[in-house]
């Protein structure tokens, strides 16, 4: 009889935990849904409050979402903290790092922005966003021979992308490769006809 009581007690505890888990999951889903609704209305403080009701510091998804909402609310320091927590929870997360660079850029933490893009490339060497911006960083300090490798990779993956072709054109000009610059500037103008910067670049191709 004593064994039966213990067995029934264990079943009761299990059923209670399952029920609690179901209620918790429902509450979390509702909080996310409500936060999306408020975000759509540009009520970012409301969206943050919705998620705060169920927030757990060890939840990757909640930290990622809070990072985005705080960024939308222009609370850049808080956004940075939440994205960092998400990165700490999922060390190979590219999406959290791409989120992180947004508030870091607004706070003018350019060293962190650059390092984060480099970290992304260690995880995902073909990430187009990271390759583009690392290439731009090298272009800005006139290291065209390094910058070209990053932008050529992006253009090879996205041949009709305006930004990549446009940037690669200026890098080619920096390297004295006018014929190559002409090709990609022309491609950029197919994507964005009449663009002033691409037109200017094309005019410099001898």
Regions found by a protein language model. Give the residues of each.
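Bacterial Sec-dependent N-terminal signal peptides
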Residues: 1-28
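Terminal, low-structured helical/coil segments at or just beyond the last alpha-helical repeat
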Residues: 25, 174-206
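Alpha-helical segment of the N-proximal tetratricopeptide repeat
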Residues: 26-56, 61, 65-72, 102
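Helix-start (N-cap) detector for alpha-helical repeat units in TPR-like alpha-solenoids
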Residues: 28, 60-62, 94-95, 128-129, ...
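Structural signature of tandem alpha-helical TPR/SEL1-like repeats
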Residues: 40-49, 72-85, 95, 104-119, ...
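Structural marker of alpha-solenoid helical repeat scaffolds
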Residues: 55-57, 89, 123, 157-158, ...
């Amino acid at each position: 009889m004593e064994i039966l009581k213990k067995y029934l007690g264990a079943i009761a505890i299990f059923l209670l935990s399952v029920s609690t888990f179901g209620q918790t999951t429902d509450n979390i889903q509702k909080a996310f849904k409500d936060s999306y609704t408020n975000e759509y209305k540009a009520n970012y403080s409301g969206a943050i409050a919705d998620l705060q009701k169920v927030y757990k510091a060890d939840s990757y998804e909640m930290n990622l979402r809070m990072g985005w909402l705080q960024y939308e609310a222009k609370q850049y320091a808080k956004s940075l903290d939440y994205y960092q927590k998400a990165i700490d929870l999922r060390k190979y997360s590219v999406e959290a790092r791409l989120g992180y660079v947004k508030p870091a850029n607004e706070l003018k933490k350019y060293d962190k922005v650059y390092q984060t893009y480099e970290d992304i490339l260690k995880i995902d060497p073909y990430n187009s966003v990271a390759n583009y911006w690392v290439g731009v960083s090298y272009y800005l300090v006139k290291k065209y021979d390094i910058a070209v490798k990053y932008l050529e990779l992006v253009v090879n993956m996205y041949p009709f992308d305006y930004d990549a072709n446009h940037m690669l054109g200026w890098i080619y000009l920096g390297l004295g490769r006018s014929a190559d610059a002409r090709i990609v500037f022309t491609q950029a103008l197919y994507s964005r006809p009449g663009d002033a910067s691409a037109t200017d670049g094309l005019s410099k191709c001898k």
